[in-house]
Amino acid sequence: MKKLLALFLALVLTLSLAACGKPGSTQSGVSGDVAEEDRYGGHVDFVLDFKPGNLDPAKSTGLWAYTFTSMIYEAPLTRDAEGNIRPNVCDFELSDDQLTLKLWVRDGVTFHDGSAVEIEDVIASIRRSVHKSPRQFVAPYIKDVVIDDDGVATITFTEYNEKTMYYIACVNPFIGVMPKEIAEKYSYESKNFIIDVADAIGTGPYKVTEFITEVAVSMARHEGYKAVEEGYTGFAAPKKAYLDSITFYYNTDDSASCIGMMNGDYDLKSGAGDYEASFITSGLTKYEKLSNTGDMINFNTHEDTIIGRSADMRKAMIAAIDWVEYFGINNTVVDGKGVNPALDGKYATDVFAKAPYFVTDGTNVETSKKYQEAAGYKGEEIKLVINSGLVTEITALSGYWKAAGINISIQNMESAAFTEYYGEKSNVWGLRYQWPSLNNSPTLLSGTIMTDTYSTPEKDKLYGELSSMIAGSDEYMAKWQELAQQMVDDCAVVFMKQTKLTWWSHPDMVFEYDGLTPYLFNAYWRNPSEHGVK
C-alpha cells in the first residue's frame, strides 16, 4: 500500500536522463555526434502558447510560459539539479547561518552590449526586486552592503528567511542581472517594466533583437557569453549558445500551431494535443523531461461552500479517486522517491501515506460516501476551475467524482483568465486544478498554497516558524512533521504528481542537457546550413 501511495505522492526534484532515439520516438536528452566546431549556426522557430507582454525578467517569470527570459537574463546565483546553490553571474561565499553573503562577478562575464558586468550592477539588480515575491523577501532583508576594492560585495541580512536566498539563487531569473542604470530606470517606484529592446540587456547566452508585443520575441547569440565551465547539473550546468538566432512565436490556437509544426512553419513546440499520432507520422521527434512543476488540487477553504466549511468533503473528493487506475490512464505520472509535498527523500514523511482518505483497496466510492455523509453533503454543485491545458487530466478525475455522487461543474479557462479568476476573492470556486512550481523545500512550495487558500492561524504560525529556520536542520524537520500532519488533517492541498513536459522538434535538432529542460541553450542542428531563417 505504501508503495502505491508513494507513487501517488511522488515528486522528484529532478532526473537526469540520456537516450538516443529515431525521429518519431520519445527521447529524454540526446547526445549528438557532431563536433563542437560544427554545431554553431542555424535558426530555430519556437512556438509557444503564451503571449509576451514585456521583456522584463521580474514580470515574465514563468519557466514554461516565458522561456525567452531565461535565455536573456541570469540570476546572480543558480541551483543545480539537487537544489544546491551554484555560481552563475557571480561566485559566492555564504555563512553557515545564511546571514552573510559574499558575491563577486566571475571573470569575463559581460552584458549583451559588450560592457563588463560590475558588482554594482549585481547589487542594483538585487535591490530592484520589482516582482512581488522578491520585493517582499529580498530587499527588506538587506541590512547592509559593503563593496571592497577587489569588487567583492558583502551583503548582511537582517534575519534569516529561506526565501531570501531562494530568489537570489533561483532557476527563474526573478532577479535578472542587468546594468545598474537600467535597474534604476525601471525601479519599483517607476512602476514601469522593460518593453524596449534597447533596455533588455542581460548576461544570458542570447540577446534580444526584436520584440513585437504579444506576437514574437527574436534573439541572437551573445558572442561574448561566458559559461560556467564547472561540471554542475541542472540550470547550473554549462550553457552553450550554438544557434545563430531564435524566434519565439506565440500562438494560442493549438490546432493552428500543430498544423504549422507539421508544415515546417515551426521547428519546436511544447505539446502536441490531439495531434501526437500525426506528429509521429510526420517524422517529428518527441522529447520528454521532468519539469519543476506538478499537478495539484487546491481546495478553496475561504468561501462559504461545503468545500470551504468541511474537511470531510475535501477528503470525500480525494477518496473517490482510484489512484491506481488513474496512474494507468495518465502516463505522465512519474515514479520516484519522495512524498507530498516534499521534493526528495530529505523531506520524506510517512504522514501522508497514513492518511485514511488515500484509498488503494478498491473501496473508493464507499469511502467517499462515508466522508460525504460526515460532511452533510446533499448534492450541492461544486465548481471546478481549470487551466485549459489540463483538460485530459481533469476529465479522468471528474469521472471518479461523478461516480461517487459528487456534483461537479467544470469551468475551463485560458491561462491568463484562470489566474485572474481564482485570484479574485469575490469569485466563488470550490477547487482548482493547476500546475504549482516545485521548489527546494516544503517552506518554498508556494505562497498561494501555504499562506492564502490554505491559511489558518495554526498553519500560519507553523509556516512562519519554518521560514525562520535553516532548511533541513533538525528543528526544521521536527516542525515540518507538525505542518505535514496539519496538511493531512485539513486536506486543503493535494499534490498528485510531478509533470513531464513534452517537446516536439524537427528530427535534425539535438538537445544536450544534464538535468535541464529542453531550453535552447545547448541545442543545435546537426546540419546548421540547412536551417536558416525561413
Residue ranges and their predicted role:
Residues 118-125, 152-154, 204-205, 242-244, ...:
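Alpha-helical secondary-structure segments
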Residues 47-96, 104, 127, 201:
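N-terminal lobe/hinge region of extracytoplasmic solute-binding protein
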Residues 137-186, 205-212:
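Surface-exposed binding/hinge segments that line
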Residues 81-84, 172-245, 255:
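Gly/Pro-rich hinge or "lid" segments in bacterial periplasmic/extracellular proteins
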Residues 206, 333-374:
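Structural transition elements
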Residues 91-135, 148, 154-159, 307-309, ...:
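Aromatic- and charge-enriched surface segment that lines or borders ligand/interaction sites
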Residues 212, 216-217, 318-350, 389-398, ...:
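Detector for C-terminal structural segments
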Residues 227-279, 407:
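Ligand-site clamp/hinge motif
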